[in-house]
Amino acid sequence: MIRDLSIAARGVWAPACANALVLPGKLNVLVGPSGAGKTSTIYALMQLIEPDRGEICLRDQDSATDINVRELAREQWWKTITWVPQHPTLIPGTLREQLPPASNDDLEAAASLCAFSDVLDSLPLRWDTPIGQGGIGLSVGQRQRFALTRALVATTPIVILDEPTAHLDAASEEVVLRAIETLRGQGRTVIAIAHRQALIEAADQVIEIHSAQMN
């Protein structure tokens, strides 16, 4: 739940969807003009920045009370989230070392769904291939597909996607939409920033964010 959230940047307040309820187990898409505060809203959710006004809360279904995410231990909160940034980077090491524990069958199934299998086939050691600083040797689109693969095999209840189709052609966009449908089918809450129409049309809920100059 987002309540009266505002984040200041360069003197501009971004009252990010003043009041909105994120639907659990559904695809929630954030839309709005560039600079409106979509990414800042995500950062606030992840405790990377602190809102200047308002709060983001979780609803405790048992007690019907709301818990401000700022009250949660950051490390424990992060364990519930898988984040796929717009420009994924990889740390030096093998691909397998950057994945959560999973069987080879699960990894291969996720890679196939995310159209990462062709990349794997081109690597000499597949999952055990060393990747350089920042994912050298993989394009931005390939790193994004790897990040989606990682999200599919993770078990976090929340998945955050920052413009997951931004660097993809129409065919690859369909791949991403299928992956998101799988996440939704797993009962996971997906929050995505989107500009492209196909992802917006696939949403269970569209949350509009607008910036506003405030004195």
Show which residues each predicted segment covers.
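Conserved beta1/A-loop at the N-terminus of ABC ATPase nucleotide-binding domains
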Residues: 2-15, 56-58
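ABC nucleotide-binding domain signature
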Residues: 29, 75-89, 191
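ABC-family ATPase nucleotide-binding domain "signature/switch" substructure
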Residues: 40, 98, 129-215
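Helix-to-loop junction immediately C-terminal to a conserved catalytic motif
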Residues: 46
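Conserved catalytic motifs of ABC-family nucleotide-binding domains
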Residues: 49, 82-104, 200
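ABC ATPase nucleotide-binding domain helical subdomain, centered on the C-loop/LSGGQ "ABC signature"
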Residues: 61, 96-132, 177-178
